[in-house]
Amino acid sequence: MLKRLIVIAMTATLAAGMSYADQSKAKVTIPVNKTAATSGKQMYANYCASCHGVNGKGDGPAAAALKMPPTDLTVLSKNNNGKFPDAHIVAVLQYGAEIPSHGSAEMPVWGPILGKMDKANPELKQIRISNLSRYLETLQAK
């Protein structure tokens, strides 16, 4: 009888531990409000400013919660010999990247998210990404 109780207790403990482990790995999905595909400024305000800040300096209200400070988006050109790295920015937005300042890739990969907004017109995803990149270019320090 005692052996049976021990087996039951161990099984219950193991099941509880597995259940807890599954919960800690659960991903949280946050709905994204749809913005105009032509407005890089609106997309930036809705999707980027919470971490990167209104002016792109990396000082948004959510920045303190990240493992590493967000990238200062105003110095992208400066850090690329004075030329805005459009192709790199488009690739990061589309596919994500291992960016040291993001720690464990905390920045969302926006390509799939933006693509879901206009399933009937997949071209709009690229238009959105391109317009967001163009807006980031306007934030560059002079």
Question: Where do the protein language model's features map onto the residues?
Answer:
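A structural signal for alpha-helical segments
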Residues: 32-35, 39, 61, 120, ...
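Bacterial N-terminal signal peptides
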Residues: 7-16
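Secondary-structure boundary/capping motif
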Residues: 35-39, 132-137
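Electrostatic cytochrome c docking/interface patches
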Residues: 21-43, 81
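Extracytoplasmic electron-transfer domains, predominantly the class I c-type cytochrome c fold
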Residues: 67-127, 132-136
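Positively charged n-region of N-terminal signal peptides that target proteins for export
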Residues: 1-5
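Periplasmic/extracellular electron-transfer cofactor-ligation site
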Residues: 41-68, 94-105, 138-142
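Mature, folded catalytic cores of secreted/periplasmic enzymes
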Residues: 19, 32, 51, 61, ...
